[in-house]
């Protein structure tokens, strides 16, 4: 008659150990920072960007969802306010060395629900490193406005047309937009309405 061999206690994984594995945070490829800019009450003589505030830097999937669910939704901000998500260490300003020679892809929306969806899809694509040219991406800005909301994807090397077109095509697919256009930061510094350099 066969008998079962005794099982050593050390061979049985403890419930606590299993729970620890489940609770371990899922690290992202890099750190990201949320920024907030409220221009709803502009003051005369105050430089652009003076109301820009760094909010939170995160590096795990769990932190991202916690911040997004509680705070960073375009529907939760007032008109003329901006939310930004940029790679940690890069400020959402033209003057930042990583942004100085770059530009931005822009998509517009006349409905808040659309902006919310496009914003979330873009955030997930960025933190999930879904772009082949992810090293050329700085971050994204959601601008809530009275007449038309705007989403802008900032990149580093505006003159690298191949990289920008690759990013543009991918982003257009991600947010399901009909048309998006790309402008250089240098043009935006000189003209209020910078012309589009690339379009997809």
Curated annotation (Swiss-Prot):
Keyword presence, Protease: no
Single GO term (MF): translation initiation factor activity
SUPFAM superfamilies: eIF4e-like (SSF55418)
Entry comment describing in which tissues the protein is expressed: Mostly expressed in roots and leaves, and, to a lower extent, in stems, flowers and immature green fruits.
Localization annotation: Cytoplasm; Nucleus
PTM description: According to the redox status, the Cys-99-Cys-138 disulfide bridge may have a role in regulating protein function by affecting its ability to bind capped mRNA.
Keyword S-adenosyl-L-methionine: no
Signal peptide: none
Keywords recorded for this protein, A-Z: Cytoplasm, Disulfide bond, Initiation factor, Nucleus, Protein biosynthesis, RNA-binding, Translation regulation
Family: Belongs to the eukaryotic initiation factor 4E family.
Biological function: Component of the protein complex eIF4F, which is involved in the recognition of the mRNA cap, ATP-dependent unwinding of 5'-terminal secondary structure and recruitment of mRNA to the ribosome. Recognizes and binds the 7-methylguanosine-containing mRNA cap during an early step in the initiation of protein synthesis and facilitates ribosome binding by inducing the unwinding of the mRNAs secondary structures. Key component of recessive resistance to potyviruses.
The protein, known as: Eukaryotic translation initiation factor isoform 4E
Organism: Solanum lycopersicum
